[in-house]
């Protein structure tokens, strides 16, 4: 039997097996005994037999072990290796068997088997990898879902806190409603009389001379809630002139037209409080053919047609007494004698020494014994146009100092008139002052050279006008001050004197009225003439030059500005004069004016169409953990609360500061604030103090509105033009905005919105209004659907966070009379232009003068002023350029308040991702804005914009606070 060989791992037979029983290291000798050989062969045969019996299980066990090790090795390698390593075969497989000892067929089968194993393992590994990636994706999704749920939890918790706060606020409002003990005032309802005036006995001239409002006026026809109804006798149907006289056709037509625009006029005489009778200017029929405003005669070669003052009155008193509603004594009648073409005393005071009984006389010229203070009314002559813009008649306000310090042109008529010693001394001193050796220039002429337009014919002495209207206008434009001499013979007012005041104010020459303590000026009950003119007694004539030099530029420009405002509002036109007369009489009686008309809103949708709604995106613009305020139902601002007190307590402000006593407004930005303790002691209604009065940081701040005024909300007005998707995105971002009352979308396009357009449901009403036409002025229309004082004007592409909006709202509540907003701009002086002009500038600057209304809060009061008070030329310029409406609003507010706007937060511009390119990025846009600023300055007569060098941020911004406290706003 051949010897057995041990097969090593290398597959090589290197040594015969030891068959000896000793188990030594040496080989057996060839001469061993046969017994030993047999014993050895038997043992080997038995061992081989046992080996063959367990060979197959052992091989299988070994293969299983090898496969497990191989799989473990591959998996451990695959986890760290790139995917390409999966297809590589491990070199360890080569070490398990000696493939060189195998036959080719077995080797091929072995290779195929290993390939199959590899393929199977690769498939399993790919499945495991795919499963692992899916698990990782699921884990990532679940983690994201967890974060979303956490955010949702925070939002819900914040919403819950807001709801709790809202419930508390609602409970407070309920308690206030229960405890309310004052009437809830609203728009007044008219309480009108329904009968004609009762017949009374006529009164004598002596009794008429002592008439005052308490003994000659019937208050029973003028209820506080009547609205002051006024009836006009048609001058064509109820003429009160003598034969041969008639009223100028221009005056009759214009008066009826202007009164037709007045809200107080009624057609039914039964409802009237007062009755207007036009008694003048009455001229001879031949004089009506003349066109010269100041002519009293025909040409010089013609015979004068002047009636005497005593025996020829152009008013037929019997016709006056026979008016259908005269009532026997003329109670509640107003006699209008408006001078226009003839300014001489005999024509402008036809009612002198006539018994007008209880009727109120309204005219320019009064004798001292004729005028009844507090009853009769002095008005300026009608020297202007019927109405409309009058800014072109005025001169620029700057520079403060003009060529001449003081000017006067006049001549005493009739020439044979004599002066008293004081008046003669005044003229002598003025002549010496004009000849004095000073650098100041004077024009003081007391004789007309060349001859005046005004011819002889006045029987009463007075200082007549020299030259033509254009020559006087040019001189006054070069005058810093204009001297006004009083009428002679102790008259309290004359038409010529008032004409001088009219012309001086129109040209920006500050009137210096000598003898003002002896005179009565127009509307003196309401207009504060001390803010418009220098009122001096005659005794101050020797100190006149010193006083004029003592006036500083700021005071001089303030006088000039106030004079122009008074002229524009109360003197400039027939419309202004008539409206002021009615307002003055109404003010005497303490009756509120008519409510200012609002623009009736017209929806773009018809009454049957219901627009589609969509859920708005939630949580895009606000931090979920920041509570900005409670959720409240819509709460309109209380309106018309001060109907019967504002003109009693703030009449001077209404007439001289706001310059608008003609309308009653729902609210004013000038309404007074209560003392701090009043909100806790008896006047708590509506107030929501921080921490119920204890104050606090961010948490308490977010729960209450606080401040110095009762709770209120704001309305967003958004102008849009054919940018539906941009509009929808902007509306969606307003969801959940605290203190938002309503959104008003002004649809400026002639095309209606698409029927399938989905409007986001943001929790408050969204009114989509049809604009009358495509105009940027529509942004500031005072729509009746705007029911709050605060109005946030925004562009449809402005992107504002909720905290920014609310901070701006809170700041506006402390600056209600100003523009409060985000993007700041300024007007810069063009140094390269020798004539000087303004440039609009949007660069970053430490000083600004405008806040653009593309994102700004304004009071609704300014919407009324922009629509009804702002000169039409400015609104026309806005339409011409389709630009500059925001500049116009800044001009208006600064003009009224003399204050700059307030900028909030650090935002300078507003980027709208994905929005179409706006017009503001065009260079033409900026060139037009340069022109707008300079044009608006010419219209106003000066540039009312004022500079500011600070912006507003919240109190605790960038302040270190304890960890258990919150800031007012996280990012502001």
Swiss-Prot record:
Interacts with sau. This is Exostosin-3. The active site is at residue 886. It comes from Drosophila melanogaster (Fruit fly). The chain crosses the membrane at residues 56-76. GO terms for cellular component: endoplasmic reticulum; endoplasmic reticulum membrane; Golgi apparatus; Golgi membrane; membrane. It is found in: Endoplasmic reticulum membrane; Golgi apparatus membrane. Belongs to the glycosyltransferase 47 family.
């Amino acid at each position: 039997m051949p010897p057995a060989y041990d097969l090593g791992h290398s597959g090589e037979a290197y040594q015969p097996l030891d068959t000896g029983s000793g188990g030594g290291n040496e080989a057996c000798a060839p001469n061993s005994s046969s017994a030993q050989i047999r014993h050895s062969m038997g043992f080997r045969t038995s061992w081989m037999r046992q080996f063959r019996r367990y060979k197959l299980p052992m091989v299988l066990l070994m293969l299983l072990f090898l496969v497990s090790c191989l799989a473990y090795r591959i998996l451990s390698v695959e986890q760290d290796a790139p995917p390409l390593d999966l297809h590589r075969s491990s070199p360890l497989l080569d070490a398990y068997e000696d493939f060189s000892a195998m036959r080719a067929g077995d080797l091929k089968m072995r290779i195929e088997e290993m390939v199959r194993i590899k393929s199977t393992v690769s498939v399993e590994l790919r499945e495991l990898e795919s499963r692992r990636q899916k698990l990782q994706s699921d884990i990532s999704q679940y983690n994201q879902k967890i974060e979303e749920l956490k955010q949702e939890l925070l939002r819900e918790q914040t919403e819950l806190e807001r709801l709790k706060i809202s419930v508390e606020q609602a409970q407070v409002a309920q308690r206030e409603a229960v405890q309310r003990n004052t009437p809830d005032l609203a728009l007044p309802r008219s309480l009108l009389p329904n009968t004609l005036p009762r017949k009374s006995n006529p009164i004598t001239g002596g009794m008429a001379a002592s008439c005052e409002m308490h003994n000659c006026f019937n208050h029973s026809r003028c209820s506080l809630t009547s609205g002051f109804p006024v009836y006009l006798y048609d001058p064509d149907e109820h003429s009160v002139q003598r034969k041969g006289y008639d009223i100028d056709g221009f005056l009759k037509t214009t008066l009826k037209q202007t009164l037709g625009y007045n809200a107080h006029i009624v057609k039914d005489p039964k409802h009237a409080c007062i009755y207007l009778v036009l008694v003048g200017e009455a001229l001879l029929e031949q004089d009506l053919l003349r066109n010269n405003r100041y002519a009293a005669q025909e040409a010089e070669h013609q015979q004068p047609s002047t009636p005497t003052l005593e025996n020829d009155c152009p008013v037929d008193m019997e016709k006056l007494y026979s008016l259908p509603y005269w009532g026997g004594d003329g109670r509640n009648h107003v006699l209008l004698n408006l001078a226009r073409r003839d300014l001489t005393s005999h024509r402008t005071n036809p009612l002198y020494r006539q018994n007008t009984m209880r009727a109120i006389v309204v005219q320019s010229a009064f004798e001292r014994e004729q005028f009844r203070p507090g009853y009769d009314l002095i008005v300026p002559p009608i020297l202007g146009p019927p109405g409309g813009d009058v800014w072109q008649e005025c001169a620029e306000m700057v520079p403060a100092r003009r060529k001449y310090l003081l000017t006067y042109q006049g001549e005493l008529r009739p020439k044979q008139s004599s002066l008293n010693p004081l008046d003669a001394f005044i003229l002598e001193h003025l002549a010496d002052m004009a000849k004095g050796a000073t650098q100041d220039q004077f024009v003081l002429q007391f004789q007309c050279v060349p001859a005046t337009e005004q011819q002889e014919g006045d029987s009463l002495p007075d200082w007549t006008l020299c030259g033509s209207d254009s020559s006087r206008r040019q001189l006054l434009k070069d005058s810093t001050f204009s001297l006004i001499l009083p009428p002679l013979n102790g008259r309290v007012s004359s038409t010529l004197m008032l004409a001088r005041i009219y012309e001086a104010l129109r040209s920006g020459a500050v009137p210096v009225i000598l003898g003002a303590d002896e005179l009565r000026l127009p509307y003196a009950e309401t207009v504060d003439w001390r803010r418009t003119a220098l009122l001096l007694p005659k005794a101050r004539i020797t100190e006149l030059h010193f006083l004029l030099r003592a006036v500083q530029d700021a005071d001089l420009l303030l006088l000039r500005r106030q004079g122009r405002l008074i002229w524009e509002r109360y003197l400039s036109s027939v419309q202004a004069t008539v409206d002021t007369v009615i307002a003055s009489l109404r003010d005497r009686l303490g009756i509120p004016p008519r409510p200012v008309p609002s623009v009736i809103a017209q929806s773009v949708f018809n009454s049957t169409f219901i627009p589609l709604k969509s859920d708005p995106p939630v949580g895009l613009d606000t931090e979920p953990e920041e509570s900005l305020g409670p959720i409240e139902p819509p709460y309109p601002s209380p309106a018309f609360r001060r109907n019967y007190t504002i003109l009693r307590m703030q009449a001077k402000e209404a007439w001289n500061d706001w310059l608008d006593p003609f309308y009653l407004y729902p609210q004013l930005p000038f309404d007074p604030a209560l003392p701090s303790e009043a909100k806790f002691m008896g006047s708590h209604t509506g107030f929501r103090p921080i921490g119920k009065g204890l104050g606090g940081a961010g948490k308490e701040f977010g729960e209450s509105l606080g401040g110095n005024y009762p709770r209120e909300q704001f309305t967003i007005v958004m102008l849009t033009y054919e940018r539906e998707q941009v509009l929808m995105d902007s509306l969606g971002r307003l969801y959940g905005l605290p203190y938002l009352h309503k959104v008003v979308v002004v649809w400026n396009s002639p095309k209606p919105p698409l029927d399938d357009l989905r409007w986001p449901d943001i929790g408050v009403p969204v009114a989509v209004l049809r604009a009358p036409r495509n105009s940027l002025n529509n942004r500031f229309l005072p729509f009746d659907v705007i029911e709050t004082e605060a109005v946030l004007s925004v562009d449809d592409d402005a992107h504002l966070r909720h905290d920014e909006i609310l901070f701006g709202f809170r700041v506006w509540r402390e600056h209600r009379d100003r523009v409060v907003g985000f993007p700041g701009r300024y007007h810069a002086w063009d140094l390269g232009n020798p004539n000087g002009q303004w440039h609009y500038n949007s660069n970053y600057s430490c000083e600004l003068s405008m806040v653009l209304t593309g994102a700004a809060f304004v009071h609704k009061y300014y919407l009324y002023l922009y629509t009804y008070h702002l000169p039409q030329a400015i609104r026309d310029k806005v339409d011409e350029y389709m630009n500059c409406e925001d500049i116009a609003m800044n001009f208006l507010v600064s003009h009224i308040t003399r204050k700059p706007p307030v900028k909030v937060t650090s935002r300078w511009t507003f980027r709208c991702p994905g929005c179409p390119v706006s017009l503001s990025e065009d260079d033409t846009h900026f060139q037009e804005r340069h022109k707008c600023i300079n044009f608006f300055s010419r219209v106003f007569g000066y540039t009312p914009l004022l500079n500011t060098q600070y912006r507003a941020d919240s109190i605790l911004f960038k302040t270190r606070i304890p960890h258990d406290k919150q800031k007012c706003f996280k990012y502001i």
